[in-house]
Regions:
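N-terminal accessory beta-strand-rich subdomains and adjacent acidic, glycine-rich linkers
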Residues: 21-260
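Positively charged n-region of N-terminal signal peptides that target proteins for export
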Residues: 1-4
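Hydrophobic h-region of N-terminal signal peptides that target proteins for export
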Residues: 9-17
Length: 260
């Protein structure tokens, strides 16, 4: 299962980890991701050069196998290095040299069911994805993902440059959402989205005078559903939201089916 979220960070100007946190740093040591299981709930936070860019934010999936949003502990973690080069056409950069540090964190429930979260941290970017691990002694080989707990909880001073998601089967020839709605620059986070459906990726945030963060999904193929961000919730931030059931004229499911 691959559902990758990208948090790209740029800092203008200059956090320690809790004792139980598992940390991974960028190659230059400035970008730090701290992963924890506080209260049985998986989460992470991001700082850059000592400045908090993302407060503790939720991780996890609700599936037909188990609820991987609570009742979890960190079972193990492994860190490795990534250093690869590749070329790509039709982009602004044709030759890419990607270096990052990777952290695999396995969360476990009391009954032994496990979820792995893989973080890749380069000098300016954080990406993560989920993997549901095989269940020993069971016949589970696939799962339905009902929803994600994945959230982005920015500091309170953050303002937004984000496009509201509009309802399905509206607009010209009932083609919306077409991801072309107007947005307000530098808007406060606690203002409801214009249509009550959250916001469309990519989403740009300004963390006061400390820097900027761009949030988007990437690496999503036909094996998973596209998503967007929910409206802001105090203390939780923005949560990953699945498609509206009315999209695509009601055909198909708004959930995701994945292999285990």
């Amino acid at each position: 299962m691959k559902h990758l979220f990208l948090l790209s960070v740029a800092l203008f100007a200059a956090m320690g980890a809790d004792a139980a946190d598992v940390d991974v740093k960028s190659p230059d040591g400035k970008l730090v991701v701290s992963v924890s299981d506080d209260g049985g709930m998986p989460g992470y936070k991001v700082s850059y050069d000592g400045t908090v860019m993302l407060e503790r934010s939720a991780l996890g999936l609700k599936t037909d196998i188990a609820d991987f949003t609570s009742g979890l502990i960190i079972d193990k973690s492994d860190e490795s290095k990534i250093d690869k080069k590749y070329e790509i056409t039709r982009t602004k950069t044709s030759a890419v040299h990607y270096t990052a540090n990777q952290l695999d964190v396995v969360f476990k429930k009391d009954d032994g069911k496990k979820m792995k979260v893989t973080f890749c941290v380069s000098d300016n970017d954080v990406a993560y994805r989920y993997t549901l691990l095989p269940i020993e002694g069971s016949d589970y080989r696939c799962a339905v993902v009902y929803s994600e707990a994945s959230s982005f909880n920015f500091p309170g001073k953050t303002t937004t440059f984000i496009c509201p998601q509009i309802g399905p089967m509206t607009g010209w020839m009932r083609t919306k959402p077409s991801y072309e709605e107007d947005y307000t620059a530098d808007a406060p986070m606690n203002v409801k989205s214009a249509f009550g459906h959250g916001y469309t990726f990519p989403c740009l945030f300004r963390i006061g005078n400390d820097g900027w963060a761009l949030v988007s999904e990437t690496g999503v193929d036909a094996g998973y559903c596209g998503s967007h961000l929910s409206d802001y919730a105090e203390g939780k931030g923005y949560t990953v939201a699945f498609p509206d059931k009315g999209e695509n004229n009601g055909f198909g499911s708004a959930c995701a089916a994945v292999t285990v």
